[in-house]
């Protein structure tokens, strides 16, 4: 860390940004998260001078949490215009009952908005203005919360979240707030002060206002020491991630969204939890606490069937079907009836007759007079039927004449439906066909597609050959697909 008086404030800030710029291709746009506070004001001003204002895009997020939010937005727009930088802003609604606290909810909403705006301008790099004092606060806060290695690693100088296209860079992370203040004073910059930053009811503010000033006289180098702790933790976390990547290759199916339960529980508890943490992060799911991960491992070890597994996390549900472990959206997509159905794959077909008790069965039937539609969107089912033009007799293809011969209907299973999957084959229950294909019960709540009163197509099974036997027909042909809106990427 550079002592605050060793060089001029301008020199150290410009040097820090020069290092960040050297990692970027020439002339690429640089998005800057601009709140209007001291830190981001210094970052925007210095970036405009070093990189050129034409490359800079100041992005502001209006949370609506302060009565001054509109004034802050106007100030930021005016400042960016004066510097010659482009400016954009987004208004977000911060959920106050999300269960994760107002600070975390605001942070999540802010990053989502920033990444959306970055995409709008084709920016692949987002500069953030956190500095060494922020890093010290983060490390100490994580220590007091009993965080693990990942938490103690705190903020990385450069980081790209899983599934994200934008790299977050923190060019000022090794500089002190005092150095940024000196820069702002040298250039007579104007910035806003968020009144909430002094509210010590928030843990971070309490550390900044009360705790860190008390540490400074007794431990003058505490910021350097905490920064080194973060670096050591980051190195240890990289090793844990390397181990988890090795384990994931051994435990995952061909589709890495699915793990083998037997292979997972062959690992010891700590290694299994490490793998689950890494796997969840690779899927873009919210992180889980050590206690939550330990509970997942415990339940996976103890579960004798899928009905015994019950792990919900951040709107998702951990599922077990046969030997497959996977996450599914948990917002009502699966029913209690379907969960019970998993417990005994060999139960009588009569059990399937209870499908009308499921959440899906409560969805209204939908109808469509087909006139060459390529997509039939069904919002209630969170998906679409897709009718793609294909050559005759391709897999799951039917004649256009059949599709237009009567109204198409999409409705829930009533129980006891039967279909033929091959010409001349026997009629079989949907339950048997789902089981044969290894479709978990919670994925069986799908809309059945009828033409008139005849069952035509079932997602994850295919075309009913009792309705269309593959015979030649005049005109075009369409392949039918069901595409859910919500998939883990």
Swiss-Prot record:
SMART domains: TilS_C (SM00977)
UniProt KW Ligase keyword: yes
GO process annotations (BP): tRNA modification
Entry keywords, A to Z: ATP-binding, Cytoplasm, Ligase, Nucleotide-binding, tRNA processing
EC code: 6.3.4.19
Membrane spanning stretches: none
Pfam family, one: TilS
Xref: SUPFAM superfamilies: Adenine nucleotide alpha hydrolases-like, MesJ substrate recognition domain-like, PheT/TilS domain
Binding site for ATP: 35-40
Superkingdom classification of source: Bacteria
Chief location of this protein within or outside the cell: cytoplasm
Catalytic activity: cytidine(34) in tRNA(Ile2) + L-lysine + ATP = lysidine(34) in tRNA(Ile2) + AMP + diphosphate + H(+)
Cell compartment(s), UniProt: Cytoplasm
Cellular-component GO terms for this entry: cytoplasm
InterPro entries (UniProt xref): Lysidine-tRNA-synth_C, Rossmann-like_a/b/a_fold, TilS/TtcA_N, tRNA_Ile_lys_synt, tRNA_Ile_lys_synt_N, tRNA_Ile_lys_synt_subst-bd
Family recorded in the similarity comment: Belongs to the tRNA(Ile)-lysidine synthase family.
Main function: Ligates lysine onto the cytidine present at position 34 of the AUA codon-specific tRNA(Ile) that contains the anticodon CAU, in an ATP-dependent manner. Cytidine is converted to lysidine, thus changing the amino acid specificity of the tRNA from methionine to isoleucine.
Domain comment quoted from the record: The N-terminal region contains the highly conserved SGGXDS motif, predicted to be a P-loop motif involved in ATP binding.
Protein name from the UniProt record: tRNA(Ile)-lysidine synthase
Organism annotation: Burkholderia pseudomallei (strain K96243)
Record gene name: tilS
